[in-house]
Each structure stands twice: as structure tokens, then as C-alpha cells.
Amino acid sequence: MSKIKARKGAPYARILGVGGYRPVRVVPNDVILEKIDSSDEWIRSRSGIETRHWASDEETVAAMSIEASGKAIADAGITASQIGAVVVSTVSHFSQTPAIATEIADKLGTNKAAAFDISAGCAGFGYGLTLAKGMVVEGSAEYVLVIGVERLSDLTDLEDRATAFLFGDGAGAVVVGPSEEPHIGPTVWGSEGDKAGTIKQTVPWDRYLPHSRLRSSGGTPTGDVSPLPLDSEGNVKFPAITQEGQAVFRWAVFEMAKVAQQALDAAGITSDDLDVFIPHQANERIIDSMVKTLKLPEHVTVARDVRTTGNTSAASIPLAMERLLATGEAKSGDTALVIGFGAGLVYAATVVTLP
């Protein structure tokens, strides 16, 4: 048996820079109310959301990612050619192959960096951060670019009163690099596939696409023959994200608070040691309930980017992080608890030092 040589990278890893991009168009609740029977007061009371950003045709997944990444790379004080790997988390890049990460890596000017996409919903940034940390410590890349990016406006049913107001678009990115001390704690992550139906796409692509081989042959992999959802004019609706709101709320508040506490325990700190809490920006009621359940001290700054950005899934944590630092609500060196959770159901939580 031959001995395989091991490769060793940095002792530890840390976030070195962060960047964000929000589309130019700001969409107030009044626009959402044009197609649903609701009110601005109801939307704010149920979600905390006042506005969200919707991308134009030019603000593609790649374009937004490149803008956010350029800022993160500059913030880290390195050049794009030093990036050894690019990890993109998204559920709204509609081309099955190739991965959008390869286009982003090329257009940024990386030197043939490894590049791939992951799909972990609203926990995607945490998954990407964990992979990046492993690459830096293992030595497969000195610097890793992690991007969370979404165009959820493309997957929003504007006639669905339960979800029409929730989602927004944007991109957030961080550069993860070497460190002599631990600045990214152990990740507490997992999945609960028995709850997969609580957040899902309304119609699988193989049922929606009129010319798919499976549909034309009269079948699907799951044998799904349920009626296709129709819009007010009788047309088959484009697939959208749907969720069981109360079930998701209960799970997020009670189960994810436990996961957040586990991340604190794994990092060897308590809530008193925290400076910042950056949960997935799903809903301000969920955020408030988690703060209460975790009994966070008053000195802890809590990200509330959801008010003006909406739920941007994989992009929400890096976007919120970028805004807190840009506004001075948080500062470089602060200790932050981050937790993402969503469709799958999946989750990932860790403690980090802010760049």
C-alpha cells in the first residue's frame, strides 16, 4: 500500500472581506398590494418588511455576484488572481449546467480558480462558509470567495397572499483566507428532510416545461399528477416558492434557537461574549422570537436588514453583515453569531469574527 502525501494549509481561517449588491429598483409594499388583498400594515406586522429590491434584466445572478465579489475582494486587500476557489450558493440560477460560479470566476479575473455552485436554500451561505474554511485549512486554496446570490423575484407568485411580499433580490460575498488564530468557529449544521414540503417549489420543472421528455411521455419521476396551478387568466403559473408559514415559523423559532445555542457552545462562548447576531433575514417576527429565546443581552446588535431588503435566501446573511459594517452598527473584530435556515429543511450556524 502506497503512502498518500497530505497537504497542509493555514492553521485557521477567517473572513477577510465582505461585499454586497442590492438591485437599483426599490419595491415598496404598495406595489405588492396591487395583486393581493392585504395592507401595508398587515405586511409590516407579519414580516417587518417595508421594501425589497427587484433585479432588472441586466442585474443577472452573475452580474450581481461580480459586483458584490469585487467589493469583498477589495475589502480583503487582495486581488482576484489570488482567489483559489469560488463557491456560489443560489436557488435562482436557472441553467442546469454549467455552474454560474465558473462564469463569475472567469469574469472576475481569477487564475482558473476552482468554481462550483451549491444549493442549500437560505442556509447556503453557512454551507459555503464551512466549505471555504475547510479548503483554506486543508491547503487546496489560500483564498476562497463565497457568494450568496438570489433573484427570488423570478420565483415569486405575486398572487399568493402568503408569500408575495416576502422575497427580494441581491448578492453578498465574503473572502475567506488564512489566519494564525481561529476566527470561524465549528459549524453546527444539518437537515430535516421529513419537513421538505414546508418550503418548496410549487411545480417541478419536469411538469412545467411543455416540451420536456417526461411530460410529453405522460409521466414524471414521482408520478405526480396533481393539478397545475393557474393564474387569474387561466395560464399555468411559472414555478414559485411556497411555504407553510406557521410550520416554518414554529420550526425556526424553537428548533433554530437550539441550533444557535449549540453553535455558541461549540465555539466555547456564551451570549454575553457576543457583539452581533446575524440570523437569516426571513422575517422580523422570527428574528425577535429567536432573540428572546436565546436571551441575548441588550448590548448585542441584531441584524434587521429584512426591513428594507426582504428575504434574499442565500444572500441574506452576507448582505446583512455588509450593511452592519457599512453603517457602523458593527465593527471589524466584533464576534458574531450567524445562522441560516430554510428549504430542505436545512440549517447552518457558526460564530465568526467580523472582517
From Swiss-Prot:
The active site is at residues 122, 280, 311. SUPFAM superfamilies: Thiolase-like. One of its GO terms (biological process) is fatty acid biosynthetic process. CDD domains: KAS_III. GO terms for molecular function: 3-oxoacyl-[acyl-carrier-protein] synthase activity; beta-ketoacyl-acyl-carrier-protein synthase III activity. It is an enzyme of class 2 (transferase). Its main location: cytoplasm. InterPro entries: ACP_syn_III_C (IPR013747), ACP_syn_III_N (IPR013751), FabH (IPR004655), Thiolase-like (IPR016039). Pathway: Lipid metabolism; fatty acid biosynthesis. One of its GO terms (cellular component) is cytoplasm. Keywords: Acyltransferase, Cytoplasm, Fatty acid biosynthesis, Fatty acid metabolism, Lipid biosynthesis, Lipid metabolism, Multifunctional enzyme, Transferase. It catalyses: malonyl-[ACP] + acetyl-CoA + H(+) = 3-oxobutanoyl-[ACP] + CO2 + CoA. It is found in: Cytoplasm. Residues 281-285 are annotated as: ACP-binding. Its EC number is 2.3.1.180. Catalyzes the condensation reaction of fatty acid synthesis by the addition to an acyl acceptor of two carbons from malonyl-ACP. Catalyzes the first condensation reaction which initiates fatty acid synthesis and may therefore play a role in governing the total rate of fatty acid production. Possesses both acetoacetyl-ACP synthase and acetyl transacylase activities. Its substrate specificity determines the biosynthesis of branched-chain and/or straight-chain of fatty acids. HAMAP family: FabH (MF_01815). Homodimer. The last Arg residue of the ACP-binding site is essential for the weak association between ACP/AcpP and FabH. NCBIfam families: PRK09352.1 (NF006829). PANTHER family: 3-OXOACYL-[ACYL-CARRIER-PROTEIN] SYNTHASE, BETA-KETOACYL-[ACYL-CARRIER-PROTEIN] SYNTHASE III, CHLOROPLASTIC. Belongs to the thiolase-like superfamily. FabH family. This is Beta-ketoacyl-[acyl-carrier-protein] synthase III 1. The gene is fabH1.
